Amino acid sequence: MKKTIILTLLQVVFFCMNAFSQDRQQPYLYLTNYTIPKQSNTIGQIRITTTDIKSVAVGGEHANAFKVSKDHELSVRPDKLKINTATFDVVLNVKTSAGELSKTFRIVKDEFIRNKVIAHRGAWKNTGVPENSVAALKYAVTLGCEGSEFDVHMSADSLPVVNHDPAIQGVSIAKTNASELLTIKLANGELLPTLENYLKAGMEQTKTKLILEIKPSELGKESSIALTRKVVALVEKLYAQAWVDYISFDYDACKEVMRLAPYAKVAYLRGDKTPAELATDHFFGLDYNFNVLEKNPDWIEQAKSKKLTINVWTVNDRLQLEELLKKNVDFITTNEPELLLSIVK
């Protein structure tokens, strides 16, 4: 009996330790926004988890361009907006009840395009380059799309790579190490892109958002959540917060992004949640196939009333595109970005 009790207690302790290890154990410093709005000098709130902020000092290369209010709101000095740079690096030195914390943030002038056009897997169909290639991303940027969507899987040794399907050229991504995957060439001669290289290419400009889809893992939920954590960590490592919005068919992965990155804009893809459910769970928006919205036509107005953004995929027909524009959806994901651009212009 004693042995059974001891084993049970050990199992409980192990479970609690494991669950705790998945949470942020240290104070996490973040901003509620990473862009400088066109019509305002206010960027966003400085926030921290697990403790409170006593004071904030600004440092770094562009320290003199920013100021912090008494309620910890970060803003840019109006005269500094004329500086001929699209990005500013700022270090926030924060004193808390638990000690001091210093972190670098990249703030981006909000010059991102607003035309509703999201290039599905980049602009590939009419350009002759492979979908989800860096070349397809660059074509989407050149066209002037508001966003370029792409898909992320994780190798057997935990490297995120960009590809739509769980396998590439017959090779399972989740069951293959990165050293082998990264020898695979796309049709245009590019190597299979790592997420890091893809993000770096996207961050060379400040016009087109990067719409990052976290793909559910063929190995199950645990692997999907592991990928989610890798993705968010890499976005923060590269200071890519201003560029990246998140989408996924995996509801738990979406919620994990929001837990790890409370500032993140996250939309859900599967179409099995009502706007009210998404709003309750603090989603940024819904991102549903057009068939879902045809079956639930009132969801568009419901989403608007809940202040959720609305993206519809994957729409390639002119009449459907025009009808959705009349309904004033926020974004349309399409394999025909050139066609949609010709309509919105």
How would you name each of these model-derived features?
Residues 21-59, 63, 70-345:
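Phosphate-group recognition and catalysis centered on beta-loop-alpha active-site segments
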Residues 1-22:
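Bacterial Sec-dependent N-terminal signal peptides
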